[in-house]
Amino acid sequence: YNVPSIEEFANRIKTTLKKYPYIVAELNGKIVGYAYAGVFKGRKAYDWSVETSIYIRLDNHGNGIGRRLYEKLEEILAKQGVTNVNACIAYTEHEDKHLHNDSVYFHKKLGYKTVGIFHKCAYKFDKWYDMIWMEKFIAEHNADPNDIIPYPMLNC
């Protein structure tokens, strides 16, 4: 696994912010986590669904930062017109120093449901990992949904 450069990471954030929120949590002036949404599938029919990502520094797990980030992220996404949030989570039957399964339990606590498992589809750290897809509905599925409001156009 290669850690992105600062420039690459900044470009990812800029690209995300063209359409979706990118939320950062700070504690005592240091970044301790972030959450954002991205395109779920690059076709018009899927505009109302997004893929979410979250990262919390390991030493800050369990203190509510992740919950607050996701609550804010989902609140903004619902205002944009998003109906479905999806999370693709690495999973292992036997936890190791690179991967624990806390993210699956975290998402379950926030109301996400497992909708699919891809077995041994991700290879990193010299090991095969499963991927679990989880989803949550954050808004009604109207018969004629409005277009998604890009994040920069939203008045939060």
Which ranges hold each PLM region?
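Conserved GNAT-fold acetyl-CoA-binding loop/helix
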Residues: 1-14
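A short helix-loop-beta-strand connector motif used in the catalytic cores of GNAT acetyltransferases and
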Residues: 13-27
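Conserved beta-strand in the GNAT
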Residues: 24, 30-39
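A conserved beta-turn-beta hairpin within the catalytic core of GNAT-like acetyltransferases
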Residues: 40-52, 61, 78-84
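A short, internal acetyl-CoA/4′-phosphopantetheine-binding micro-motif in the GNAT/acyltransferase core
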Residues: 53-61, 89-94
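Conserved acetyl-CoA-binding loop-helix of GNAT-fold acetyltransferases
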Residues: 62-79, 100-105, 109
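Conserved GNAT acetyl-CoA-binding A-motif
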Residues: 77-102
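Conserved catalytic-core motifs of GNAT/GCN5-like acyltransferases
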Residues: 88-90, 104, 108-127, 139-140, ...
